[in-house]
Amino acid sequence: MSIVEVKQNAEQKMQQSVDSFKNSLTKIRTGRANPGLLDTVHVDYYGSMVPISQVANVSLLDARTISVSPWEKGMGAKIEKAIRDSDLGLNPAAQGDLIRVPMPAMTEERRKELTKVVRAEGEHAKVAVRNLRRDANEGVKKLLKEKLVSEDDERRAQDEIQKFTDRFIAEVDKLVAGKEQDIMAV
């Protein structure tokens, strides 16, 4: 393995950690409706549990309401029950074939609780990035130990790895700040 491969591997894995964090942020409810909120809700479809998006069209009616249109007539009640039974705290209402999912207003206490969750998730993402930095630096040191690179090259590689780390940690901080702002907006 060369220094270039170690750096590319580190950057790629750091990007994956940040992408995973972005994905986990979409599951945290803000005051606004987001169709991605229902991605974690599964419904019984002929004996197997599948995401709602595989049995219905999920879209926004307005800023505070998600609409779910089942593709099969008999799925409406099952989808409504699955949303109600999920831990999202949502109360769907069926109107013919359409299921409306209004987003309840969040209390100040719930908002503060969610910002703590967002910060904790952000901290986990930063720890993951730092662990990847450590692994990459160890890989570079191993190359130095095997005399495959010079000390100058090792130092340069560690500096570049640190720049990757700083960039991804700044991105995580930016995502956390944006999500907190979304949550605290009334």
Swiss-Prot record:
GO biological process, one term: cytoplasmic translational termination
Pfam family, one: RRF
Transmembrane residue ranges: none
Subcellular location: Cytoplasm
GO molecular function: ribosomal large subunit binding
Domain of life: Bacteria
Keyword Cytoplasm found: yes
Keywords associated with the record: Cytoplasm, Protein biosynthesis
Main localization, broad class: cytoplasm
Entry-linked SUPFAM superfamilies: Ribosome recycling factor, RRF (SSF55194)
One Gene Ontology cellular component annotation held by this UniProt entry: cytosol
Family: Belongs to the RRF family.
UniProt function note: Responsible for the release of ribosomes from messenger RNA at the termination of protein biosynthesis. May increase the efficiency of translation by recycling ribosomes from one round of translation to another.
UniProt-recorded name of the protein: Ribosome-recycling factor
Organism of derivation: Polaromonas sp. (strain JS666 / ATCC BAA-500)
Gene: frr
